[in-house]
From Swiss-Prot:
UniProt record, GO biological process: regulation of pH
Origin species: Mycolicibacterium vanbaalenii (strain DSM 7251 / JCM 13017 / BCRC 16820 / KCTC 9966 / NRRL B-24157 / PYR-1) (Mycobacterium vanbaalenii)
Function: Na(+)/H(+) antiporter that extrudes sodium in exchange for external protons.
Reaction catalysis annotation: Na(+)(in) + 2 H(+)(out) = Na(+)(out) + 2 H(+)(in)
Localization per record: Cell membrane
Gene (UniProt): nhaA2
Name of the protein: Na(+)/H(+) antiporter NhaA 2
Transport as UniProt keyword: yes
GO molecular function: sodium:proton antiporter activity
Alphabetized Pfam families for the sequence: Na_H_antiport_1
PANTHER family: NA(+)_H(+) ANTIPORTER NHAA, SODIUM ION/PROTON ANTIPORTER NHAA-RELATED
Keywords: Antiport, Cell membrane, Ion transport, Membrane, Sodium, Sodium transport, Transmembrane, Transmembrane helix, Transport
């Protein structure tokens, strides 16, 4: 390619990476957090729109739980949370409290969506491209390691099993995060929205791995082996495009029950079921046209139907039962905030997450000699890393697993997660609002459609 053609292509795509025939040079010059394709931007926007609604419902549910747990009627809240429902049938132990049903059962729906997202990202999303996947994966790992190290350092001499909570400040709650973005009304650029979502997806993968490996005690091999049967049948049905819920739901429930009985946390069943669903589907099968659900892929079909249940019911109900903590006034709050476990969680979320994500991103930039996209600044990455410090749903779940629901340390975990998440959200809002004028300008560029063809002009140079 001649110099004039090369320069012209750069002028046509002012915020894209430089084009060169040398693959090694292409990797070197690739911009970090570059704008994605129109189809990918549309998909991310739709997901975050649903998560925003779910995040607002989550905040309302958590606030209601806090108010009730600290009211004169607090005993009725804890009685409701600890009310046992279920029984033991065929040797299966399903006599759980309502709080446990929410944590083990409803969150499995959330992790089913996580599994679908992960499958979609690795097969058809940003994570399928190693050069684009490197940043969110590295950032997620950094955002997990540093908060965990901070928690361990703070609690190194605490003793009595305090270090079991090392993973609590490592999670990111995407629903809470996008609810914060909705409240502050910032016009976040598409590249940052995609980065936040992909980071959260990888973060969820790391979280479920941690839960399965570090918070599983005794395993019943027979139950785990039996769980393979309904999971395999579910996989066959999904691969064949079966959409009959009267068949899929019982298979899903059977998988969940057996995984729960095995000793592995039942939410792992949700991820496995999500992984079983195919992303792509041919437009024809045996020479015949298939319907829209199969044509777009069963993963998208499942996600469109399950995500509203996850965001609107499963996560808010879990938050309602998990966030209720009796603070005990200013003296109780002061005592809780002075506890090493609470302090380790707050520091991990507020300081550890931003440090881990930002430093990892800077190191990746230096190692690959890739500069940040020209429309963005490093303060934008700082704002995103602070927003990732909102660790609510999964952090509360890990706290329950580490110290036991209702224990004194579990109460400290809740105060630490709530305090750390609110502080991280406030700091992120301050940083992002300082850039809102630039975000509005980028938003105008990303939505301008002078030729009125339905695709913003800035995406016209990309092949979707």
């Amino acid at each position: 390619m001649c110099r004039e053609d090369w320069s012209a292509s750069i002028r046509r795509r002012p915020v894209r990476q430089a084009v060169t025939s040398d693959p090694r040079a292409r990797r070197i010059r690739r911009a970090l957090l570059a704008r994605g394709s129109w189809s990918e931007t549309n998909r991310v926007t739709e997901i975050l729109r649903k998560e925003t609604v779910g995040g607002i419902i989550l905040l309302v549910a958590a606030a209601a739980a806090l108010i009730w747990a600290n009211s004169p009627w607090s005993q009725s809240y804890f009685a409701l949370r600890d009310f046992e429902l279920g029984g033991e049938w065929l040797g299966l132990h399903l006599n759980l409290t309502l709080g446990a049903w929410a944590a083990d059962g409803l969150l499995a729906i959330f992790f089913l969506v996580v599994g679908l997202e992960l499958k979609r990202e690795f097969v058809a999303g940003d994570l399928r491209d190693p050069s684009r996947a490197a940043l969110p994966i590295a950032a997620a790992v950094g955002g997990m390691v540093v908060p965990a190290l901070i928690f361990v350092l703070v609690n190194l001499n605490t003793g009595d099993g305090a270090l079991r909570g090392w993973a609590i400040p490592t999670a990111t709650d995407i629903a809470f995060a996008v609810a914060v973005l909705a409240v502050i009304s910032t016009h976040l650029p598409s590249a940052l929205r995609t980065f936040l979502l992909t980071l959260a997806v990888v973060d969820d993968l790391l979280a479920i791995t941690v839960i399965a490996v570090f918070y599983t005690d005794d395993i019943k091999a027979w139950a785990l082996a039996l769980a393979v049967v309904p999971l395999a049948l579910f996989t066959v049905c999904a691969q064949r495009g079966v959409q009959k819920w009267w068949l899929l739901v019982p298979l899903s429930v059977a998988t969940w029950v057996l995984v729960h009985e095995s000793g592995v946390h039942a939410t792992v069943a949700g991820v496995l079921l999500g992984f079983a669903v195919p992303v792509h589907r041919s437009a024809t099968r045996r020479g015949q046209q298939v319907d829209h659900a199969e044509r777009v892929g069963m993963a998208e079909y499942f996600e469109h139907r399950v995500r509203p249940i996850s965001a609107g019911i499963a996560i808010p109900v879990f938050a309602f039962f998990a966030a209720g903590v009796s603070i005990g006034g200013l003296s109780g709050l002061s005592r809780a905030l002075g506890d090493p476990i609470t302090l380790g969680i707050v520091l991990g979320l507020v300081a550890g997450k931003p440090i881990g994500i930002l430093v990892t991103t800077r190191v990746l930039s230096a190692v690959t000699r890739a500069s940040l996209d020209s429309s963005l600044r490093w303060v934008d990455v700082l704002g995103m890393s602070m927003l990732a410090g909102i660790g609510f749903t999964v952090s509360l779940l890990i706290g329950d697993l580490a110290f036991g629901m209702g224990s004194e340390r579990d109460e400290f975990v809740k105060i630490g997660v709530l305090s750390g998440s609110l502080l991280a959200a406030s700091l992120a809002a301050i940083v992002l609002l300082t850039r809102n004028r630039a975000y509005r300008r980028i938003h105008r560029e990303e939505t301008a459609d002078d030729d009125h063809d339905g695709v913003p002009d800035v995406y016209q140079t990309r092949q979707d």
